A protein has these predicted regions:
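Contiguous, often N-terminal, cationic amphipathic patches that form binding interfaces
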Residues: 2, 6-94, 98, 103, ...
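Glycine-rich active-site/cofactor-binding loop and its immediate structural neighborhood
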Residues: 110
Length: 133
């Protein structure tokens, strides 16, 4: 049974923030990259989502990310109450009800992240950056 979690910075080369759990058997550390990958997969499996988006800082344009780079469209924030908040940027298909797609993504991401990591998701914020034809 996981008892306590705390935020710490990793000492690895990537410098990803990590969520640390303590149990009777030892310690479990979960990188923010894990949350980003799980979130990206859950979001892109929802109906109406074309893919994850990334806004280039150089030209300001929105780019559709390849499946192997979808975590770039996700930002994970660790909260003081041992929960996470997730912001994701997506591209949707033309003709779908955007509000319904976003509600579906919010529900799916909360469920899948909680199921796979055991961490409570406080908020999921979905930003629709583009619509494809």
């Amino acid at each position: 049974m996981l008892r306590k979690c705390a935020l710490r910075r990793s000492s690895g080369k990537e410098g990803y923030p990590m969520l640390k759990f303590h149990s009777e058997q030892g310690e479990i550390s979960v990188s923010s990259a894990v949350f980003s990958n799980i979130t990206g997969m859950a979001a892109t499996n929802c109906f109406g989502v074309k893919g994850m988006a990334y806004r280039s800082m150089t030209d300001g344009l929105v780019h559709l990310l390849r499946p192997e780079a979808m975590s770039k469209g996700v930002k994970v924030t660790y909260n003081d109450d041992h929960t996470v908040s997730i912001e994701l940027h997506i591209v949707v298909e033309n003709g779908v009800n955007i509000a319904t797609v976003c509600r579906s993504i919010m529900s799916e991401v909360k469920y899948v992240v909680s199921l796979n990591t055991g961490v409570t998701v406080k908020a999921v914020n979905v930003c629709v950056d583009s619509v494809t034809v």
